[in-house]
């Protein structure tokens, strides 16, 4: 199995990317990595080049670049060349911590969409209090969606949750403003009826305040709402830990208490660290495309590679394709 990695994407590239790659090669003997980027900037950080191939790319798609224009014009960029490795069959999956819009564009137009999938969905796995995590999709691939798109999101998310988490008969929830059946706008009301009539394990509407309680294994929504939910969860977690730190360092007595509580605090922090779950997978494409967080460190890249490996190993993309074809046949 070979995974292509954009060495130049992210706030801490290329060092954090390469450190994460080398950590993954130590952990997984069955993978090989193609590092795509400026060879002169990559080589100084490689301590062991076993199972690493460098593909030189002199251009970088910057966070400020307009996504579609950048993918079209920067043909020698690390992100475009990385996606081409997958589309041309030299890699089984790809990972980038770079420009999110550009990665989605490269995924859609270079890697390619699965026939029958109307809209791809961006799906991170987020932490829950019991440590099992849940999948949230879409978080921004498409700000607008139709009920049929959300049903496809639920199908793709269920396949991922069943194969990768793994969860038997994963619970699907519809993000809404209330748990009652008739709550919401036209989109959620129509989606509710479609999900209720599907073969999925639909548990009904779920509210954002309950997401971290683990009320569902897969939560579907449109990309606009999903992105707001994602950023709210991230921001709240950061604020809580900031307040804890300020409180526990505010006095000598508080510092003593913090020292006594340190193991439990570290345990709590680890449980709520979303980087432990990997990156956000772009579902609906012919091969796995993973968006790592822009601020990814070595550990986050390691988990993104582990996630890509799991998706390839469990044939998630192929199973999604089979399911779509089966539904198309049934409809005709």
Swiss-Prot record:
One of its GO terms (molecular function) is phosphate:acyl-[acyl carrier protein] acyltransferase activity. It is found in: Cytoplasm. Catalyzes the reversible formation of acyl-phosphate (acyl-PO(4)) from acyl-[acyl-carrier-protein] (acyl-ACP). This enzyme utilizes acyl-ACP as fatty acyl donor, but not acyl-CoA. Pathway: Lipid metabolism; phospholipid metabolism. Belongs to the PlsX family. Homodimer. Probably interacts with PlsY. It comes from Bacillus pumilus (strain SAFR-032). Keywords: Cytoplasm, Lipid biosynthesis, Lipid metabolism, Phospholipid biosynthesis, Phospholipid metabolism, Transferase. This is Phosphate acyltransferase. The keyword NADP does not apply. One of its GO terms (biological process) is fatty acid biosynthetic process. It holds the Pfam family FA_synthesis. Its main location: cytoplasm. It comes from the Bacteria. It is an enzyme of class 2 (transferase). Its EC number is 2.3.1.274. InterPro entries: FA_synthesis, Phospholipid_synth_PlsX-like. GO terms for cellular component: cytoplasm. It catalyses: a fatty acyl-[ACP] + phosphate = an acyl phosphate + holo-[ACP]. The gene is plsX.
């Amino acid at each position: 199995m070979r995974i292509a990695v954009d060495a130049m994407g992210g706030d801490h590239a290329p060092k954090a990317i390469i450190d994460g790659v080398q950590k993954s090669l130590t952990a997984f003997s069955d993978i090989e990595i193609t590092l795509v980027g400026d060879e002169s900037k990559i080589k100084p950080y490689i301590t062991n080049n076993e199972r690493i191939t460098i593909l030189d790319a002199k251009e970088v798609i910057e966070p400020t670049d307009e996504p579609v224009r950048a993918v079209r014009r920067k043909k020698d960029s690390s992100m475009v060349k990385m996606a081409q490795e997958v589309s041309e069959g030299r890699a089984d999956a790809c990972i980038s911590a770079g420009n999110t819009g550009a990665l989605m564009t490269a995924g859609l137009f270079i890697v390619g969409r699965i026939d029958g999938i109307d809209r791809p969905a961006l799906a991170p796995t987020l932490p829950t209090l019991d440590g099992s995590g849940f999948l949230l999709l879409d978080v921004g691939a498409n700000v607008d969606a139709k009920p049929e798109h959300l049903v496809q999101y639920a199908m793709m998310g269920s396949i991922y949750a069943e194969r990768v988490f793994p969860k038997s008969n994963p619970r699907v929830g519809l993000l809404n403003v209330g748990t009652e059946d008739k709550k919401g706008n036209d989109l959620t009301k129509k989606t509710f009826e479609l999900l209720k009539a599907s073969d999925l394990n639909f548990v009904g509407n779920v509210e954002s305040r309950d997401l971290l309680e683990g009320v569902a294994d897969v939560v579907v929504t449109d990309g606009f709402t999903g992105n707001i939910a994602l950023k709210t969860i991230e921001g709240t977690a950061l604020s809580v830990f900031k307040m804890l730190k300020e409180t526990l360092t505010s006095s000598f007595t508080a510092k003593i208490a913090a020292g006594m509580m340190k193991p439990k605090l570290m345990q709590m922090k680890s449980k709520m660290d979303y980087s432990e779950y990997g990156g956000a997978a772009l579902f609906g494409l012919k091969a796995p495309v993973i968006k790592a967080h822009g601020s990814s460190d070595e550990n986050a890249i390691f988990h993104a590679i582990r996630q890509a490996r799991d998706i390839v190993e469990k044939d998630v993309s192929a199973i999604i394709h089979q399911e779509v074809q089966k539904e198309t046949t049934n409809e005709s």
